[in-house]
């Protein structure tokens, strides 16, 4: 039976051309800073983001956590959104590893603004934790792949500078934002002190993320990466996959966005499904299921039986994610399955 797997863009697999690039990659010992392919990737990302330096890490979680460690002190507080990845999906690492607590605000579909952040800054009082860092996520996973307006990022960053607070951007899917808007990585990252980017989601690399910032930040991030077991030796085979992805896979994200919009428009016409198509900005579609029509968990189960895999995202919410291995034919296969179940 045909299977259309829309659970996540982390399901992407290396293409034959990417595997060839990995197989022929020049490698060295990266712990000694001698892997030429990793160095090439780090230099490329530093240039693309407009930062002084970059550091290859094994995962987005590792990238975010070394960024928190490098820019905070134990006992401080980090401002973030209550639906962000750092708060929900990193195993409490901010407390476990950095010794900081998260002040998770109720953003609008995951997005914060200057007013929210300004109100969350702690007074200078011995009773309160000191605010140490602001974290944003762009695009926002639980927000449905929505994009931070560049002007809002600017307002937040300018306020943060006035408070002498660094801003970290979880940009795991920032690639999607750049493709959707035409705004470059450098333009987005000018309003951050540090940024993490992921290669193993829509870009299709098997492993790896990267953080970028000034040289002092990268020096500290390097220390924490090593402390967390992230020092790798001949990692150029992984960096080669990332370099191939940037060159060959990045433009294809536009097709994921087009399919997500078309998918949302079709779902919008179905009884029992609520998803305003205009809210779909990139490759993620999160839709509400009317519990009077069908239970969300039951819908996910019935879809799976019929060869369509999705992820339940709450009592009444389901997420579908378009990615490198999803075709127009896959979308055309999935939609009649919905109609049959909802009939």
Explain the meaning of each model-derived region.
Residues 1-278, 282-306, 310-326, 333-342:
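Conserved PLP-enzyme active-site core in the AAT-like
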């Amino acid at each position: 039976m045909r299977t259309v797997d829309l659970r996540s863009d982390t399901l992407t697999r290396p293409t034959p051309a990417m595997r060839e690039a990995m197989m022929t990659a020049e490698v060295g010992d990266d712990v000694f800073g001698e892997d030429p392919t990793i160095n090439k990737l780090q230099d490329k990302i530093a240039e693309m983001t407009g930062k002084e330096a970059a550091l290859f890490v094994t995962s987005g979680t590792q990238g975010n956590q070394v960024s928190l460690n490098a820019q905070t002190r134990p006992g401080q507080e980090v401002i973030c959104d209550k639906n962000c990845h750092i708060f929900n999906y990193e195993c409490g690492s901010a407390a476990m590893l950095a010794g900081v607590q998260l002040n998770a605000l109720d953003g609008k579909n995951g997005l914060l603004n200057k007013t929210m952040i300004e109100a969350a800054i702690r007074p200078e009082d011995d009773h309160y934790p000191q605010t140490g860092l602001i974290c944003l996520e762009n695009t926002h996973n639980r927000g449905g792949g929505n994009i931070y307006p560049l002007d809002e990022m600017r307002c937040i960053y300018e306020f943060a500078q006035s408070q002498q607070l660094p801003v970290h951007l979880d940009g795991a899917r920032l690639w999607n934002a750049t493709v959707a808007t035409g705004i470059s990585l450098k333009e987005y990252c000018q309003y951050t002190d540090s940024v993490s980017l992921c290669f193993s989601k829509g870009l299709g690399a098997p492993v790896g993320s990267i953080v970028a910032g000034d040289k002092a930040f990268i020096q500290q991030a390097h220390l924490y990466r090593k402390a967390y077991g992230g020092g790798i030796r001949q990692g150029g085979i992984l960096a080669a996959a990332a370099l191939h992805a940037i060159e060959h896979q990045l433009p294809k994200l536009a097709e994921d966005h087009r399919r997500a919009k078309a998918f949302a428009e079709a779902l919008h016409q179905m009884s029992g499904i609520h998803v305003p198509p205009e809210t779909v900005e990139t490759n993620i579609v999160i839709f509400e299921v009317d519990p009077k029509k069908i239970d969300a968990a039951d819908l996910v189960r019935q879809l799976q039986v019929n060869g369509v895999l999705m992820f339940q995202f709450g009592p009444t919410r389901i997420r579908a994610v378009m990615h490198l291995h999803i075709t127009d034919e896959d979308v055309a296969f999935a939609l009649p399955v919905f109609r049959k179940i909802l009939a």
